Each structure stands twice: as structure tokens, then as C-alpha cells.
């Protein structure tokens, strides 16, 4: 490449007095009476821009003094140690080439000032240019790379599971249909129902809600696998924690029980939090200053503390006895709400907590039934400051019990014939969990809404770009 990343220069990886070229966008321009302009140039490789000191002796100095926020430039000059506060290095420029101007700078949506989160959502195609979303993007990348690295080091294989599926993993029916049929002229059966045999796949097809079921097939042969990809839920949930399209990390581990995956989940979270604290300290300091003052300290505490563990039944007893008035009543057999989970993590245990062995009637068909006949080997990991961050279970490996559960939930066994085959041919105990990646990024950065930690959020009524 003919230019260097600004991050390389600011980390001191390039010798002082070297001739360097950087390319990026103008953050700010300041002109002095001494005939010198100071350009803050940013290329997205790190939080801070680098300052270019531009003398009026340049042939195109008039162009330089016309630069505004957002203009793209190529700057060549000598890298020197900076005498000014706030930066370690700067460039004494001997050439500035304007690559792209900003039309109508006064109306530039990302002018150099603070913008509200709501405003940035309305300009999602330009918001990566801001300090906040730029920092979110780098932290998100760091977390994703750390997740892949963790599983690689643990001997897991990354499996790419299908986006288009005919299976409903959760059995909830909140799925997006995929079809090439003419919506204005649908083919009908003799019963007046849509004839999906005429569709592209010859049957109903949907966007996946989870890669888990497909992942189990590979765990049943490769022992340790994980998926990391987009998932889709057609939930009518307009909250700060829900998206219609989001990314999931889903490991599946053969010859493993609930305790094994609870331990794996704890190891993974601590690994990726350490990575972001070490690799993206500059961005995390920004979040601690501008977004969530405990952004760094709570991750450090998370890494140091052992996770607490509690059975669902005991958790209900704790909540009932605590004397706190909740918006939603606490009863055995009812799923815990976010307020209940956060009380347990933030006030009772004051640590991340694994809640396990939930009532079978509120959990999915594939979760292993416990010996009491009332609960399943399921778990949620709840973190202070956000609530549930991971959900997982030991999978039901006994065919007769799985079949009974499918019947009980009104699910067609023929639709799951391939899944049932795994229990017919060398079945083994196996377990896995799902991590909502956007919730993880929101927790790490302190951003209050998952819509602000994914590039182009998809929510009910909103699919712009």
C-alpha cells in the first residue's frame, strides 16, 4: 500500500523523521495567524486522528484553508514527535491532495458537533464517521475476532449453517418467510391454501432463527463446533434489546452436560473481555468518559469474579423473600423478567450469575428433561448492568422423550426427521448455548440500545438501506 494506517503512526511503529503518507477524512481544521493550518485527519484505524501541520508555502494552500469536516485527503510529510498536548506524533506536511470535497458544508449531516443517538440512527449511512459509532465498530470487530480466536484455541470448528431453513428451532413461529411466489397471484390448493409446492424450494421456507439444530448435526460427528452468523426473528418487540436481524454465537459440544457449557461460556466471556481491554483501550476510555463511566471497571471486575450459580427454584425463592416490589410478579413456572434477573446479578449476588434448571413448560422442545419431570437442564447467564446475555441447555439425546415433547408442543415429527436421526444413530449427551452478539457489544460499550451497535439495524417498520 502507498500509505500507512494512522494507528501505526500513533503507536510508534514508524521511525520519527520518516517520510509518510496517510489518507483519511478531515475531522477539524484550525488556521493560525502565522500562516499554518492544523488538520486533524482520521482514517478509522484507531480512536484518535493524527495532526498534520500544513505551512502556507504549499502551492495549494488556498485549497487547504477551504477544507471542512468530512473532506477526504492524502497527506504526505515527515513524522515528528509532537510538542502539543493530546498527541504523541504529528506530520509536518509537504503535500496535501484533496481527494473529495464535501458539497454544501453547512448542510453536511455529520458536521463537527455532537449529535443525538436518534439523529445518528436517521443517518446510519454516515454515522460511522462519528467518534461514537467508529469506536463501537472497532470494539465490535475486536469482540468478533476474539470469539473466533477463543474457539480456535479450544479446538472448535467453525460451521456455516444455512440462512434459509424449513425448521423452527424455537417452536415459536416468529419467522420470516422466504418465497419467490407472486404475492399478487398466489397458487392455491384444492382447499384454498397457498400451494407451496409451486415455490422455489417446493415447500415453505424461512429465514433461520438459530443455527443450533444444524450445528448439532456437526457436533454429532466433529465433537466441538460453533456457528457465528445472522439470525432473524419476526418478533413485534420495539425495545432496546431486540432486533429483527442480529448475530448469534452458538457453540455445540458433544459429550458435555450443562455444567460443561456453563464453564465454557464463562471462559469465553472472560477471554473476549480481556481482549477488548487490552486491544481497544483507547475506545473503551472514550466509552468510560462519554457513555458509561463504569465501562472499563465493570469488565475488569467481570474478568476477576467467579460466576455465581443458582437453580431457578432457589432464584424464585430469593426474589420472593427480598422484599423488593417488582413490576412483574414472581411465581414458579413463569419466566424471569429482566428486572428479576438484574436484581439477582446486581443486588443479591453482585456478580454474573448462572440460573439453571428452568421449568420445562417455558422452555424449548430440544432441552433435556431432568429426572424430576418438571424442569429441564437449561441455563441463562445474567450479567450486572444488562441482564441475560447467554442462554443454553443440555440437549435431549433420548429419542422417546424428544418425540413425546414434539407431540406435546404440536410439532410435526416429520419436519424434524433429520434431527431425530441424530438420536437413532450413535446418540450422545451434548450441550450448547447461544450468545446474542449485539447484546454483548452493547454491554461492553455501555450503549443503551442494540440498534446502535449494528451497522444497519432491522426492526419492525424499519428496513432502510
From Swiss-Prot:
Gene3D superfamilies given in the database record: Bira Bifunctional Protein, Domain 2, Nucleic acid-binding proteins
Principal location class: cytoplasm
SUPFAM superfamilies: Class II aaRS and biotin synthetases, Nucleic acid-binding proteins
GO cellular component, one term: cytoplasm
EC class (word): ligase
Documented EC number(s): 6.1.1.22
Subunit comment: Homodimer.
Name of the featured protein: Asparagine--tRNA ligase
Species of provenance: Pseudoalteromonas translucida (strain TAC 125)
Origin organism lineage: Bacteria, Pseudomonadati, Pseudomonadota, Gammaproteobacteria, Alteromonadales
Amino acid at each position: 500500500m502507498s500509505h500507512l494506517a494512522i494507528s501505526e503512526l500513533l503507536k510508534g511503529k514508524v521511525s520519527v523523521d520518516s517520510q509518510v503518507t496517510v489518507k483519511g477524512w478531515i475531522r477539524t481544521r484550525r488556521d493560525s495567524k502565522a500562516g499554518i493550518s492544523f488538520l486533524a485527519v482520521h482514517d478509522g484505524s484507531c480512536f484518535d486522528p493524527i495532526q498534520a501541520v500544513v505551512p502556507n508555502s504549499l502551492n495549494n494552500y488556498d485549497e487547504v484553508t477551504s477544507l471542512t469536516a468530512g473532506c477526504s485527503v492524502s497527506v504526505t510529510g515527515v513524522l515528528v514527535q509532537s510538542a502539543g498536548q493530546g498527541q504523541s506524533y504529528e506530520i509536518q506536511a509537504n503535500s496535501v491532495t484533496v481527494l473529495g470535497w464535501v458539497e454544501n458544508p453547512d448542510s453536511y449531516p455529520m458536521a463537527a458537533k455532537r449529535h443525538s443517538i436518534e439523529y445518528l440512527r436517521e443517518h446510519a449511512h454516515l454515522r460511522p464517521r462519528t467518534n461514537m459509532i467508529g469506536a463501537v465498530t472497532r470494539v465490535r470487530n475486536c469482540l468478533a475476532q476474539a470469539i473466533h480466536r477463543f474457539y480456535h484455541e479450544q479446538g472448535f470448528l467453525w460451521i456455516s449453517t444455512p440462512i434459509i431453513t424449513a425448521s423452527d428451532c424455537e417452536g415459536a413461529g416468529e419467522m420470516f418467510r422466504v418465497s419467490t411466489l407472486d404475492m399478487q397471484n398466489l397458487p392455491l390448493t384444492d382447499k384454498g391454501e397457498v400451494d407451496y409446492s409451486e415455490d422455489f424450494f417446493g415447500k415453505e421456507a424461512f429465514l433461520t432463527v438459530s443455527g443450533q439444530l444444524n450445528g448439532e448435526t456437526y457436533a454429532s460427528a466433529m465433537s466441538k463446533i460453533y456457528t457465528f452468523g445472522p439470525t432473524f426473528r419476526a418478533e413485534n418487540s420495539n425495545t432496546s434489546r431486540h432486533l429483527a436481524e442480529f448475530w448469534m454465537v452458538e457453540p455445540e459440544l458433544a459429550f458435555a452436560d450443562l455444567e460443561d457449557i456453563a464453564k465454557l461460556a464463562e471462559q469465553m466471556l472472560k477471554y473476549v473481555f480481556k481482549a477488548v481491554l487490552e486491544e481497544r483501550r483507547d475506545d473503551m476510555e472514550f466509552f468510560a468518559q462519554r457513555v458509561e463511566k463504569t465501562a472499563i471497571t465493570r469488565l475488569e471486575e467481570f474478568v476477576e469474579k467467579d460466576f455465581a450459580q443458582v437453580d431457578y427454584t432457589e432464584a424464585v425463592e430469593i426474589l420472593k423473600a427480598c422484599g423488593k416490589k417488582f413490576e412483574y410478579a414472581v411465581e414458579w413456572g413463569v419466566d424471569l423478567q429482566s428486572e428479576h434477573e438484574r436484581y439477582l446479578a446486581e443486588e443479591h449476588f453482585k456478580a454474573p450469575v448462572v440460573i439453571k434448571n428452568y421449568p420445562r413448560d417455558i422452555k424449548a422442545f430440544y432441552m433435556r428433561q431432568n429426572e424430576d419431570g418438571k424442569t429441564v437442564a437449561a441455563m441463562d447467564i445474567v450479567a450486572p448492568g444488562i441482564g441475560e446475555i447467554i442462554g443454553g441447555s443440555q440437549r435431549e439425546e433420548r429419542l422417546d422423550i424428544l418425540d413425546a415433547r414434539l407431540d406435546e408442543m404440536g410439532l410435526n415429527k416429520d419436519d424434524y426427521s433429520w434431527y431425530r436421526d441424530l438420536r437413532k444413530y450413535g446418540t450422545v449427551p451434548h450441550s450448547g448455548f447461544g450468545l446474542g452478539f449485539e447484546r454483548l457489544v452493547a454491554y461492553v460499550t455501555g450503549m443503551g440500545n442494540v440498534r446502535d451497535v449494528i451497522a444497519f439495524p432491522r426492526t419492525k417498520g424499519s428496513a432502510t438501506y
